[in-house]
Amino acid sequence: ANMLMLSSSLQQENESQEHPGVHQVPGADDPKGLGPDVEPIVNKYQPNCLFYHNVNRADLRWGGSESGTVGYPCWSSFPYPYSHSNATDGVTDHNKLLAHGDPNGKFWVPAMADTPLRGYNGRHEWFWEPGDDDKAVYPLANLMEMYEKSVGRNATLMVGLTPNPDGVIPEGDVRRLQEWGAEINRRFGQPLAATSATGKKKVSLSLGKVQPVNYYLIQEDITGGERIRAYRVEAQVNGKWTTVAKGTSVGHKRIESFPAVEAKSFRLVVEECTAEPLIRNFSVYHVN
């Protein structure tokens, strides 16, 4: 197929290293409806392969749209083992489950948010077409919004790239991807302060001095599952703890902005959890 899929390495960086040899089969079915016949062949020769968005089996969950975003909250757990199958697509509220998952689900089916890079100005191109130009490429601001509403909501962001007839990604697309990576690193590469904790429901950060802050990032150690059910982030302003953000799902990564506050100390307060919290990362940033 004349298409490449690029998954955000920042979302599943550790998971991919922990599970070498795991590959992915996209979900498009054979034109004759023979897609399910591929499954036993794949299972025989690549038993660790994951299926994505296939009508017979989907180990990875489509987030419900091709906008590059998912809803919030977004849980990685799900009530049945495949997000799509002929047996479950008729389930009540199926589309809601795709977007949000189920905090009490018994199966680990993380969400993917997909979008073509060339989806701007009324275009939505998963494949290269004659006459294509850079005007179809999403602006950087749109891509950053997608990042925060996918990776920042506990999903993997998957971006469709379109090789041209020479078999290469167009130069304009490459430049935009480079700009995107640089902007992600600029915003979130150097936290003002960061920490981790095990078993604590209050996790504090000291910035050393009063500074403006307008973003936070939380990560759970998902080898222990998603344990947090509700939390808040507080800033100590004029000696008083003030709530600057509240949320529910965290999972692999939660990134959110809030109106800038100037403070020296911040803390994460876990209001509800299913077991002791495993905080892999709690950090704050100032993005301008």
Question: What is the role of each PLM region?
Answer:
Residues 1-238, 243-258, 269-272, 276-280, ...:
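Mature catalytic domains of secreted/periplasmic carbohydrate-active enzymes
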Residues 265-267:
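Short, conserved beta-strand segments of beta-strand-rich sandwich/propeller modules, principally
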